[in-house]
Amino acid sequence: MKTFSAKGNEVKRDWFVVDASEKVLGRLATEIARRLRGKHKAEYTPHVDTGDYIIVTNAEKVVVTGRKFKNKMYHHHTGFPGGIKSASFEKLQDKNPTKIIELAVKGMLPKNPLGREMYRKLKVYAGSEHPHTAQQPKQLEIEE
């Protein structure tokens, strides 16, 4: 019996919608990353993108445990000398709530071209509305 290896053009990709309301950020992000990679499928192949499309709604209502709401910091560099910028979870959630989930999931995906391809299948929206109704996404429940 030969080992099965999935081919990129033969993989069936489904669309799922996840409601992030009152979900813990890390637990939500790990399940999303797992689904984007395709590890939940029997035909998972490490060097092929076998994952599904994930739509995350209500990103503004995601929660963190402990004191991370005030103390967790996000950093980025502008590219100019002395250009390190920092923002707390609280400020980033007010300014750009989708960025929090995007950064959490992106850090859990491979850091290579295949990981970037997987990341493109993630769609995050701050509110409960999304423009992907034509894809008929299924509701995905993520337990706490």
Swiss-Prot record:
SUPFAM superfamilies: Ribosomal protein L13. Keywords: Ribonucleoprotein, Ribosomal protein. GO terms for cellular component: cytosolic large ribosomal subunit. One of its GO terms (molecular function) is structural constituent of ribosome. CDD domains: Ribosomal_L13. PROSITE patterns: RIBOSOMAL_L13. This is Large ribosomal subunit protein uL13. The gene is rplM.
